[in-house]
Amino acid sequence: MDLETLLAKQEIGDVIYRYARGIDRLDFDLVRSCYHPDAVDDHGAFKGNVDEFIEMCREFLPRWTATMHFMGNVLIDEIDGTAARAETYAVA
C-alpha cells in the first residue's frame, strides 16, 4: 500500500468520526459536510441522499436527551482516484 492510499484512508476515517460527532451534537451542517453532493447513505432501514437523511435525523434524533455513537470495524477499500467505498459499524 502506498503513502497516497494510506493518507486517503486516514482522511476517510476522519470523515466517519466527524459524522458521529455531528450526529451526537445535532450539528447537521457538520453532518452534511461529511457527504459528497451526490452521495447515497445506506443505513439499512434508510437509503437515500444526504438531504433526505438529514431531514429524517432532524425529526428523529431530538427524541433523545443525548446520543453517543461508537464507530468501529472501519473498513475502507476500493480506493480508486476520487472514489472509495467504506463500511463502518456503529453502536449508538
Regions found by a protein language model. Give the residues of each.
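Short, low-complexity N-terminal intrinsically disordered segments enriched in polar/charged residues
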Residues: M1-P37
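A solvent-exposed, acidic/Ser-Thr-rich amphipathic alpha-helical stretch
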Residues: R25-A92
